[in-house]
């Protein structure tokens, strides 16, 4: 049994990885900031110790896993090197783990977490599958056949992995603090494609993914009969979204997803494609799909009287549009109110007009102050720059949260990758509910 210490254990990937190693029988602990982060709930539920940062946390005979947000000058990393311990980056360590399984990486600018969560749930309906999801959830199942994991393109971290399969949901310009432009993003995905050992499953409507070259087959999914696997006869019901799936032009089977929105059907198609290629039992796959409950911070709902309170991680214009679309399709007779907290100054600056356009699809818009990051906590613009671009938009904070009570028959979308859950909880407290998120 190895003793692992995770520096930055509350990070979404680090939290998941720590849980996996714990499940596989290792001794696990970690350190992080003392502020509450939603990922710590799962860690505490498994009895994994979370410590404040301190060089004295590092002991002899530990293996230290270094989170991507922390430099080698961090006090705990310095102490680990002084003790001549093995210090392994998150990406390199995960890359070592996946080689023990038939692995499926899920990557793309948007939809990674939802698709990874769906993939792990559905595959476990037929074969034991360990998984690492970007919502801070991870599980290591002994004697697993498969390993499903989220692979992030930021700073080209995903190039540490050599998976058997890769699902590529889309290529889009994001992380403007690192990538120069869309061509730079494409180059990263192109390099990743050459790491894949068996096959790539890619969204057929993405113009950039259509240009990807690989040493393995590329299977495209979508809504067109020119795709290798596609959905037709899509019907929205009170149970979710029903659709027929065709493979190479031939009817494969009828499926029901309990979710709503075109993007959820696309996610399901990618997962069904993997299941088809690995010859998993389609009856088991269908049953598992119908019981998928979603992942953390992806359209998580709480209903109070005539209001539906939604917690969602959307922090890019396309993700915001998809979340609003889901609300419209699932609740066509309700008003849609967007409460959004921009994440990082560089992203807000780069997509200012796009944020305004996507948020304007809601009936009302409320904006929070911009949330910075460890690497970037100031910028040239303010939230007022975005407010000025959206008709009727206004600033909201914990002191003014009661303004949301006026929307009697509405879906209230709390969106963002920062600490917007503080605002959600403040509102829920006013409504008489506590600790929902």
Curated annotation (Swiss-Prot):
InterPro entries: Mur-like_cat_sf, Mur_ligase_C, Mur_ligase_C_dom_sf, Mur_ligase_cen, Mur_ligase_N, MurCDEF_pg_biosynth, UDP-N-AcMur_Ala_ligase_MurC. It is found in: Cytoplasm. GO terms for molecular function: ATP binding; UDP-N-acetylmuramate-L-alanine ligase activity. GO terms for biological process: cell division; cell wall organization; peptidoglycan biosynthetic process; regulation of cell shape. It catalyses: UDP-N-acetyl-alpha-D-muramate + L-alanine + ATP = UDP-N-acetyl-alpha-D-muramoyl-L-alanine + ADP + phosphate + H(+). It holds the Pfam family Mur_ligase. It is an enzyme of class 6 (ligase). It comes from the Bacteria. The keyword Transcription does not apply. Its EC number is 6.3.2.8. Pathway: Cell wall biogenesis; peptidoglycan biosynthesis. Belongs to the MurCDEF family. Cell wall formation. Can also use L-serine and glycine, but they are incorporated 4.3- and 7-fold less rapidly, respectively, than L-alanine. This is UDP-N-acetylmuramate--L-alanine ligase. It comes from Staphylococcus aureus (strain NCTC 8325 / PS 47).
């Amino acid at each position: 049994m190895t003793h692992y210490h995770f520096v930055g254990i509350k990070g979404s990937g680090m939290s998941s990885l720590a849980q996996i190693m714990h499940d596989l029988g290792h001794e696990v602990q970690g350190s992080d900031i003392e502020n509450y982060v939603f990922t710590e709930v799962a860690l505490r539920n498994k009895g994994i110790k979370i410590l404040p940062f301190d060089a004295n946390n590092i002991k002899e005979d530990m293996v230290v896993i270094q989170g991507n947000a922390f430099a080698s000058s961090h006090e705990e990393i310095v102490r680990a090197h002084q003790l001549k311990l093995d210090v392994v980056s998150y990406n390199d360590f995960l890359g070592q783990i996946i080689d023990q399984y038939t692995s499926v990486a899920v990557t793309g600018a948007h939809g990674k977490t939802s698709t990874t969560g769906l993939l792990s749930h559905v595959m476990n309906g037929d074969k034991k599958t360990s998984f690492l999801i970007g919502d801070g959830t991870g599980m290591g199942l002994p004697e697993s056949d498969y390993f499903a994991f989220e692979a992030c393109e930021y700073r080209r971290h995903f190039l540490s992995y050599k998976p058997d399969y890769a699902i590529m949901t889309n290529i889009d310009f994001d992380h403007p603090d690192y990538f120069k432009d869309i061509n730079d993003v494409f180059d990263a995905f192109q390099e990743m494609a050459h790491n894949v050992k068996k096959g790539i499953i890619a969204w057929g409507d993405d113009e950039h993914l259509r240009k990807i070259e690989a040493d393995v087959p590329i299977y495209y999914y979508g809504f067109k009969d020119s795709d290798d696997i596609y959905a037709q006869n899509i019907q929205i019901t009170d149970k979710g979204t029903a659709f027929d799936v065709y493979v190479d032009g031939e009817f494969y089977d009828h499926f029901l997803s309990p979710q709503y929105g075109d993007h959820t059907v696309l996610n399901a198609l990618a997962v069904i494609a993997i299941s088809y290629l690995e010859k998993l039992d389609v009856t088991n796959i269908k049953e598992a799909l119908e019981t998928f409950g979603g992942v953390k911070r992806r359209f998580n709902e709480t209903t109070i009287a005539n209001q539906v309170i939604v917690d969602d991680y959307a922090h890019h214009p396309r993700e915001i549009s998809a979340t609003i679309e889901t609300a419209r399709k699932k609740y066509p007779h309700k008003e849609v109110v967007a409460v959004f907290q921009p994440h990082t100054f560089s992203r807000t600056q780069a997509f200012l007009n796009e944020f305004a356009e996507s948020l304007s699809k809601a009936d009302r818009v409320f904006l929070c102050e911009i949330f910075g990051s460890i690497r970037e906590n100031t910028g040239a613009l303010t939230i007022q720059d975005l407010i000025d671009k959206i008709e009727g938009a206004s600033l909201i904070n914990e002191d003014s949260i009661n303004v949301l009570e006026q929307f009697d028959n509405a879906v209230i979308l709390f969106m963002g990758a920062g600490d917007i859950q503080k605002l959600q909880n403040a509102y829920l407290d006013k409504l008489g509910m506590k600790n929902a998120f």
